[in-house]
A protein has these predicted regions:
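Structured, active/binding-site neighborhoods that engage oxygen-rich ligands
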Residues: 2-189
Length: 189
């Protein structure tokens, strides 16, 4: 249920905008799934070495786990933004915690640490700061960039809010300035 002061995404939405939003999220998930087989190989040379003829038969994801962490967390953020009408860090983080407990496919070390802290009652942004402080060598962060899609869709008409939320959503799993910077840069473009 939307908060009283939240902007509703209800019936006033332009149907064409809804169709475009669905298309953007579908394209994001499809592209992500196609990239999963090469995700941890690192360089183009490593990918060519592992797949000299290209990826011909991407691994089928497990039935119980259709999405990896980046896609799942992006879709859950989109769901939170749609249902809450605005960015609610606690709501998004709790959705991610439930997903982690039920599935958690592909979740990174820092994201898991931060979400476990959230599960224990730590405020989401503080959880991100603590997770990064405990294991700074584990910082990665392309998921923050993927999650810019629902942020841009929701706040396309409010650049100030778009910039703020793009940075905030990146800080929850782990407060890594590079993730926030890249997510902000890509969202604004």
């Amino acid at each position: 249920m939307p908060k009283p002061n939240a902007v509703s995404l209800g019936p006033m939405l332009d149907p064409e905008l809804v169709t475009r939003a669905r298309g953007a999220l579908l394209g994001l998930v499809a592209g992500n799934q196609l990239g999963v087989p090469t995700e941890h190989l690192g360089t183009p040379a490593a990918i060519r070495a592992a797949y000299p003829d290209g990826v011909r038969d991407p691994a089928t994801p497990p039935k119980a786990s259709p999405y990896d962490d980046d896609a799942a967390m992006t879709l859950l953020l989109a769901e939170s933004l749609a249902e809450q009408g605005d960015f609610d860090a606690a709501d998004a983080a709790q959705r991610w915690v439930r997903w982690m407990k039920a599935d958690g496919r592909g979740i990174g070390v820092l994201t898991r640490r931060a979400l476990k802290l959230v599960e224990r009652g730590v405020e989401p942004f503080e959880a991100g700061r603590r997770a990064l402080a405990e294991a700074p060598q584990s910082a990665a962060g392309n998921g923050a960039v993927m999650r810019c899609v629902p942020v841009a869709l929701r706040f396309h008409d409010n650049p100030d809010r778009l910039i703020r939320v793009a940075t905030q959503q990146a800080a929850i799993p782990f407060d890594y300035v590079v993730s926030g910077s890249y997510s902000l840069k890509i969202t604004v473009k």
